[in-house]
Each structure stands twice: as C-alpha cells, then as structure tokens.
Amino acid sequence: MSEETQDERWERLGGEISSFDFDKLVQNKRSNRPDLHALLLLESIFPGRDGDIIGHAEHDQIWLDFDEDDSEKLTDEQIVELSACGVFYDEDSLSMFR
C-alpha cells in the first residue's frame, strides 16, 4: 500500500470542512476570527520561528510559510481545526483564501 500524500491527507480530513464550521469544530478559540485563530495556532505548534508567517500573497490567496515537512508534523485533529479556519494544503504549502 502506498503512503498517503499530504494532498490526500488534507483532502481526507478537511475536504468537506469550511470556515462556516469554525464555531462548531473549534473548542478553544484563540480568536473569534478564524484566520487569526489559524495563525495563532500555527505559531503555537511551531514556536520560535523568525520572519513573517505569510510567505507569499497573490490576488485573493495567501501562502503561509509552512511547507510539506511542517504539514507532516501536524496531527489529524490540528488539520481539522485548521481546515475549519479556512487553511488548506496547496502547492506543497499551507494556504488560505482571503
């Protein structure tokens, strides 16, 4: 059996989740704003990093400075929580629409 890719993992765990699920799925809110909650959650999971958390922005999408190796370290529960904040996996990076 082949190993699940990060694209497949994010689709399996968060594919049906949207930011409309934020209030239902996120119990310990760091902010009432889903996007800010996601950024604060990522900061707590990966503490001590320097530089901006937003790596790139284009039109209505931002790419966060977290790559495939970082994504592999996330638990399934964290992926569900991030998905409820509008975070998704795209082009080997975490991303959000805004």
Predicted regions and their residues:
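Short, compact, well-ordered microdomains
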Residues: 70-98
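Acidic, low-complexity, intrinsically disordered interaction modules
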Residues: 51-81
